[in-house]
Amino acid sequence: MNEIEQRIAELNKLLHEYGYAYYVLDKPVVADSVYDQLLHELIALEEANPSLIFPDSPTQRVGGTVVEGFKKVTHDYPMLSLSNAFNEADLQEFDRKVRQAIGDHFSYVCELKIDGLAISLKYENGVFVQGATRGDGVVGEEITANLKTIHAIPLRLKEPITIEVRGEAYMPKKSFEKLNAQRADNGEELFANPRNAAAGSLRQLDPKIAASRQLSTFIYAIGGDGEIYGIDGHAEMLDYLEDLGFPSNKERQRCSTIEEVMAFIEHWTENRPHLAYEIDGIVIKVDRYAQQDELGYTAKSPRWAIAYKFPAEEVVTTLLDIDLTVGRTGVVTPTAILTPVQVAGTTVQRASLHNEDLIRDKDIRLGDTVIIRKAGDIIPQVVGVLIEQRPENSVPFEMPKNCPVCDSELIRIEGEVALRCVNPACFAQIAESIKYFVSRNAMNIDGLGDKVVEQLLRADLIHDVSDLYHLTIEQLVELERMGEKSATNLVNAIQASKENSMERLLIGLGIRHVGEKAAKIVSEQFGSMEAVMAATEEQLVAIYEIGDKMASSLVEYFSNDDARAVIERLAEVGVNMTFKGKKVEVVVGDNPFAGKTIVLTGKLEQLTRNEAKAKIEELGGTVTGSVSKKTDLVIAGEDAGSKLAKAEQLGIEVWNEDNLIEQLNLI
């Protein structure tokens, strides 16, 4: 190593140590001027010797090349959301269920719920290689370059391990105030709260903008099975993350009873204004992994954790108007237009009125002073009216008799609270149906946003979803803010969607009561759109998990001549009409996975956890996250922990990875 290489290595080491002390430990060991001087020296050396730039160099934090967009990434392990508690009764019920399942010998770990943006960080051999947003929990967006600008995120860990961690990126209150002051001076729109500011900063295409926003982070979990790192619980995991160099929130506490949990909540309800960052609640988790495994998961969240949300904030403001929108199924939804008001750190100008019955029951009128509540709900609610402040000339609000978009007569189906427009030619319904068709969970056509869809309809370029596949670059470049490159990308994305497996098309058709799961089940069972269209209600309800409502809705939809005509046109332009997944034909005795409940634990070498799960599910098995008496088989990789021990205790059959591969090869 020559003198320059040695100095660059020395500067990297010093700057990492100083940065860790400043941003993670909050205990600076040198003056800012000293740090800046060393950083500038390193920048100069790297500019003169670009081949000597380390991948984890502190200079990589200042922001790199502007990107064209964020690519989608699938999380190795889903980023599940938590169930919510809004009062002491909710927490008591959670505690009762936990004790009923695992007894009284356990403890909780209570942590502050940071009000920011959930992120996932991947490290290979100790080096930060990828960062992503939570997205929908399964698929997020890669924002590695922007996350590198957060000084609290280590670019190299203290051990050369491969690991994925989860955390919350946030904007400190002081950074938020400074940013909004700058935006006010520049005549720019202000951010409503630090959470929005953090999310907006991390979605900037230019990392230099993110770098200027002074974000920070707390890391609170390992993605996947923490036991493979020799950890047996959540509190120990947080200590382990700190030892690796990650910032974790120190304001946490182990509690033995729900009364201790409530005391912790009361303390931070009172003291949250004194924190340097925003919090919106407290997260409560059962500590030991073995007990977490015993409690298991619901479809959406773990049974061993809950998020207590601070009490709803209520404010009063004036109802200026009631806006009526028409959805893809024709439902007319009323929304309150309000004098802007701050609620729970957010500027609120619109609030949900749900339906005609709520407006009538609460006698909500234009000009009223109304009570707005916002808690765990994303959408604020109108919860009451101050009758004593009502204007003298007010009159009861009447829902219209006709559609606000197409003027067709509105109807109310028996048993429903909603008014509906049943005109299939209604502009709003067509627009919303096409937006749904192209959405991520359906045909997933990137670049075809709401405004583009509306422009295409108004330009008379499309009338239904089949027309999308006839669009040309020449037509698209005539649209507002649509250049040739964007038009080319959009046409390519539309054409690529033709190759989707049939279940995506079935989702995109927007058939009532038919969601993602039902669409996949029906597609797998029948194999082709033609077969589904010919199916009877009796054939459909005979399928496991397809109920009467779904079956009736499918038959009704496909008996409509207009719907069948659209599907025929889609087929004519080349949209795939068959199921592309593997249809399992189970032969008793030939397949050891079919109908079995299986748990994967430990580290697999020949397959990833997701690959193993997919293969087992293709063969009719169900993969769960916890071991119980209902488990048929546990497949244990290296460093398997409490799940393996519990399987042996319960006498459940256990395979190693070689057994799994051997059986897969026999099928």
Curated annotation (Swiss-Prot):
Q: Which Gene3D superfamilies match?
A: 5' to 3' exonuclease, C-terminal subdomain (1.10.150.20), 6.20.10.30, BRCT domain (3.40.50.10190), DNA ligase/mRNA capping enzyme (3.30.470.30), Helix hairpin bin (1.10.287.610), Nucleic acid-binding proteins (2.40.50.140)
Example of a GO biological process term: DNA replication
EC id: 6.5.1.2
Name residues in a coiled coil: none
The entry marks the following residues as binding Zn(2+), namely: 403, 406, 421, 426
A single GO cellular-component term from the record reads: cytosol
Q: Got any disulfides in this one, which pairs?
A: none
What is the protein name stated in its UniProt record?
A: DNA ligase
**Lineage of origin:** Bacteria, Bacillati, Bacillota, Bacilli, Bacillales
Q: Name the gene for this chain.
A: ligA
